[in-house]
Swiss-Prot record:
PANTHER family (alphabetical): 1-D-DEOXYXYLULOSE 5-PHOSPHATE SYNTHASE-RELATED, 1-DEOXY-D-XYLULOSE-5-PHOSPHATE SYNTHASE, CHLOROPLASTIC
Binding of Mg(2+), residues: 145, 175
Annotated pathway: Metabolic intermediate biosynthesis; 1-deoxy-D-xylulose 5-phosphate biosynthesis; 1-deoxy-D-xylulose 5-phosphate from D-glyceraldehyde 3-phosphate and pyruvate: step 1/1
Enzyme class at the top of the EC tree: transferase
MF (Gene Ontology): 1-deoxy-D-xylulose-5-phosphate synthase activity; magnesium ion binding; thiamine pyrophosphate binding
Name the record gives this protein: 1-deoxy-D-xylulose-5-phosphate synthase
UniProt-listed SUPFAM superfamilies: Thiamin diphosphate-binding fold (THDP-binding), TK C-terminal domain-like
UniProt keyword annotation of NAD present: no
Length: 637
């Protein structure tokens, strides 16, 4: 039996002697590498926090002391140490979530994958404890992987600093290798000294005594304070935390469990907000990750353990198509620039950055700033393309509405991972954008069905100079190209009923990547004698007027979209028909309006009846019901 086999909960961990902790850390890393190699996941960040997470669970009493993980992809080790070692189905249906999950364990307080939020949760929890007179619980927030580049984190820090008696320990996991831990004993001595109440009392007494001295008192205090601050700045980074009024200790070697435990205990016992700055190495202990210059295996699919090479996934990816076309457009138009929110490689902008390094701006995890900065770039005569995951666009809705659309600025938002993404669960499904963006004036939305249309629509979007545009596309492999058999206005017709059909039964509006499924449905219904027209609007906001005219020729209209059913394209189509006084039923087939558990995209679609079989069955019933109703409505002869 391995040492890891004996650890089932934090109490077991606390019983281990210090001498066995390095072995435990090594076994955890071996476990992570072997398991994530089969399932895929966030390997690099978790290899970097093994010792840190061990120390957290030895010092604090989880779940009584809440441990909040910002960018929750750092929580794999936390799961292991809290009794969740079944990683065989990590991020798969019925298995462990890739993020903290309240449904999984009482040790998980927040289901967190959108960054920069943990400190606000911590502030609220600590205020609640203070208000209720609870003085023996410490709130711990682990932030890192760029979370402190988000403005929300600094808003929270500013508020946390006001609570002088709130028990909050903020652990900054610094895996950016920006600071050197080889500062020596003097820095550790200063850190230990400052983390005592006696030191605080001594400072207050000395300050009062010096300031009371006639003539020279205040100038002398200012001079000594400046010397002290300058010395601290010289030997310690990140003194901005103390400028906010927060106590700071570090940097600490995050791979030295004993050193981290000492720092955490002093922070815990201080009884007020404290920053503990630890230095870790992303990908620690696995050479292929350590040597991976791009992102130290931040997130990846299944891979070969011996080499670190990913298992091949055949097929062209949507992100790759966007990446390639952006480089081509960049060569043709020098005014096209790109913005990313700490997602240069995942969103496909790395190639553009390599080709045009002066025309890419990585603003950190700051989507709000990205949107308004893009508006400024547009005002300056450029055309910015903001590449962001669809789920993260939610974070800057006000900026899109008021800073970009209100000013009619030509900004293109490229929304990657739109629709159901699957493996990463509720927080990463991009199923909200088509709904929330419907209300934005002056905004146009394009949804490509294949690689050819993604290239076309991206170019069309960038050519629009009197308002913002959105191009959304899913995660994964691009389906085969579906050629249009006809065009009506700006829409592509993908299927027509058999010749001789006077009045087609069904108009099937296929939104973007749902086109392939809709064409399969049309073929199934045709075998049953049901006449179906399949159209791809290409641009779903504003709707092409030709869609209304085409709908008038059919008995039923059905809209199939990879978005929440409420307030999206289906509702827009129904509203357009009502405005035209057309009494034609419109049925919307989209994602159920709930937070979805992690599973494969195809599996989730099938469960919701959004696969070809489920849609064909339902649409057959709808067409039959409509035909019966039409017969009943006919006047008696």
């Amino acid at each position: 039996m391995t040492l890891l086999d004996s650890v089932h909960n934090p109490d077991d961990l606390k019983k281990l002697p210090d001498s066995q902790l390095p072995q435990l850390a090594a076994e955890i890393r071996e476990f992570l590498i072997s398991q994530v190699a089969r399932t895929g996941g966030h390997l690099g960040p978790n290899l970097g926090v093994v010792e840190l997470t061990i120390a957290l669970h030895r010092v604090f009493d989880s779940p009584r002391d809440p441990i909040l993980f910002d960018t929750g992809h750092q929580a794999y080790v936390h799961k292991i140490l809290t009794g969740r070692k079944d990683f065989s189905k990590l991020r798969k249906e019925g298995g462990l979530s890739g993020y903290p999950s309240r449904a999984e364990s009482e040790h998980d307080f927040i289901e967190n994958s959108h960054a920069s939020t943990a400190l606000s949760y911590a502030d609220g929890l600590a205020r609640a404890y203070e208000l209720q007179g609870i003085t023996d619980r410490t709130v711990v927030a682990l932030v890192g992987d760029g979370a402190l580049t988000g403005g929300m984190a600094w808003e929270a820090l500013n508020n946390i600093a006001e609570g002088k008696n709130r028990r909050i320990v903020i652990v900054v996991n610094d895996n950016g290798r920006s600071y050197s831990p080889t500062i020596g004993g003097l820095a550790e001595h200063f850190a230990n000294l400052r983390m005592t109440r006696g030191y605080e009392q001594m400072l207050a007494t000395a300050k009062n005594a010096i300031n009371r001295a006639p003539v020279v008192g205040p100038p002398l205090y200012d001079a000594l304070h400046a010397f002290k601050k300058g010395l601290k700045d010289a030997i310690q980074p990140q003194m901005m935390f103390e400028d906010l009024g927060l106590k700071y200790v570090g940097p600490i070697d995050g791979h030295d469990v004993a050193a981290v435990e000492r720092a955490l205990r002093r922070a815990r016992d201080f009884g007020a907000p404290v920053i503990v700055h630890v230095l870790t190495q992303k990908g620690k202990g696995y050479a292929p990750a350590e040597n991976h210059d791009e992102d130290q295996f931040h997130a990846l699919g299944a891979f070969d353990v011996a080499t670190g090479r990913p298992q091949s996934t055949p097929g062209l990816k949507w992100t790759s198509v966007f990446s390639d076309e952006m480089v081509r457009i960049g060569a043709e138009r020098e005014d096209v620039v790109a913005i990313t929110a700490a997602m240069l490689h995942p969103t496909g902008l790395a190639a553009f950055a390599e080709a045009y390094p002066d025309r890419v701006f990585d603003v950190g995890i700051a989507e709000q700033h990205a949107a308004t900065c893009a508006a400024g770039l547009a005002m300056g005569g450029l055309h910015p393309v903001v590449a962001v995951y669809a789920t993260f666009l939610n974070r800057c809705f006000d900026q899109v509405l008021m800073d970009v659309a209100l000013h009619r600025q030509p900004v293109t938002f490229a929304l990657d991972r739109a629709g159901i993404t699957g493996d990463d669960g509720a927080s990463h499904n991009g199923m909200w954008d088509l709904s929330i963006l419907q209300v934005v004036p002056n905004l146009s939305i394009a949804v490509p069905r294949d690689a050819v249309r993604l290239r076309e629509l991206l170019r069309e979007a960038i050519s629009i100079d009197d308002g913002p545009t959105v191009v959304r596309y899913p995660k994964g492999v691009v389906p085969p190209a579906i050629p249009a058999v006809d065009q009506i206005g700006g829409m592509d017709v993908l299927r027509r009923p058999a010749s001789g059909t006077e009045a087609p039964d069904l108009l099937l509006v296929a939104v973007g990547p749902m086109a392939q499924t809709c064409c399969e449905v049309a073929d199934r219904l045709a075998d049953q004698g049901i006449g179906v027209t399949v159209v791809d609007p290409r641009w779903v906001k504003p709707l092409d007027p030709a869609l209304v005219s085409e709908a008038a020729r059919h008995s039923v209209v059905a809209v199939v979209e990879d978005n929440g059913r409420v307030g999206a394209v289906g509702d827009a189509v129904a509203r357009a028909l009502r405005d035209a006084d057309l009494d034609i039923p419109v049925r919307t087939f989209g994602i159920e309006q709930r937070f979805l558990e992690h599973a494969k995209r195809d599996r989730i679609l099938a469960q919701m009846g959004l696969d070809a079989q489920g849609l064909a069955r339902k649409l057959t019933e709808i067409v039959a019901q409509r035909a019966e109703q039409s017969l009943e409505d006919e006047p008696a002869s």
